[in-house]
């Protein structure tokens, strides 16, 4: 199709990483961000709260985006991922950063009580709050593939308002650029479901942001800071 042709063209003539990922969901949006110089050095605005957006992977991996709302812009200032660590580790990571936090957005599975902990089982969200990561806002998990695709569309929509710190968010940016549809080898077509790989967690945590915060606050809390800015100028 047209998108595949464009991807192959980018790959062949520009050695473009974005183009080389066939079926990448956010290729167009991330390429636009690069062209508009929105993947750059993004300073932390000290007087503005930092919101965090999480993905709690089933394979014990954890990803966190750190985002500020400044004017009409989402400033994606930091990113962290790890695996095999307990929540205390992530609470420590957050505390060691200089940020003043707003809410922490976690997917719905964070609200599920841990079965292994006996009668006094606490959910991961409750454990996080006990560790000082609070308040936690629970974001509904996509229940089916339609909801996943709606979340991908929400992420595409919000990417045009995002500025990424290219150093602190390098792994997260790579995850967004590499997040792609499964390729059906038998039929030689892209399937309608995302490939689960190393890019999934960063992309899922970003979807927590797009669905749990950006869509819900459009025209409300974020507009209190809104000011008119040209697309390629960062708010001060």
Which role fits each region the language model picked out?
Residues 25, 63-66:
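A short secondary-structure junction signal
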Residues 196-217:
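Acidic, Mg2+-coordinating catalytic module of metal-dependent nucleases/exonucleases
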Residues 20, 65-195, 216-220, 224-228, ...:
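Mg2+-dependent endonuclease catalytic cores in nucleic-acid-processing enzymes, primarily RNase H-like
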Residues 9-13, 64, 104, 176, ...:
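A residue-level signal for conserved active-site and pocket-lining positions in enzyme catalytic cores
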Residues 1-56:
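ATPase catalytic-site recognition across NTP-hydrolyzing enzymes
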Residues 3-7, 11, 166, 170, ...:
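Short, amphipathic alpha-helical segments
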Residues 58-60:
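Beta-propeller domains
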């Amino acid at each position: 199709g047209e998108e595949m042709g464009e991807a192959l063209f980018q790959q062949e003539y520009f050695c473009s990483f974005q183009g080389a990922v066939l079926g990448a969901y956010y290729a167009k949006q991330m390429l636009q961000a690069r062209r508009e110089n929105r993947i750059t050095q993004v300073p932390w605005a000290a007087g503005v709260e930092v919101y965090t957006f999480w993905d709690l992977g089933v394979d014990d991996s954890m990803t966190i985006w750190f985002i500020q709302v400044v004017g009409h812009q989402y400033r994606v200032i930091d990113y962290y991922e790890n695996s095999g660590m307990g929540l205390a580790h992530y609470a420590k990571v957050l505390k060691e950063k200089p940020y003043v936090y707003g809410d922490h957005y976690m997917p719905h599975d964070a609200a599920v009580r841990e079965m292994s902990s006996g009668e006094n089982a606490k959910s991961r969200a409750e454990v996080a709050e006990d560790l000082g990561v609070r308040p936690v806002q629970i974001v509904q998990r996509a229940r089916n593939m339609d909801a996943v695709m709606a979340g991908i569309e929400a992420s595409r929509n919000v990417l045009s308002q995002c500025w990424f710190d290219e150093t602190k968010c390098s792994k997260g940016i790579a995850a967004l650029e590499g997040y792609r549809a499964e390729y059906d080898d038998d039929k030689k077509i892209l399937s309608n479901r995302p490939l689960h790989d190393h890019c999934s967690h960063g992309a899922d945590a970003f979807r927590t942001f797009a669905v749990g915060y950006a869509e819900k606050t459009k025209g409300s809390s974020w507009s209190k800071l809104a000011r008119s800015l040209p697309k390629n100028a960062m708010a001060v």
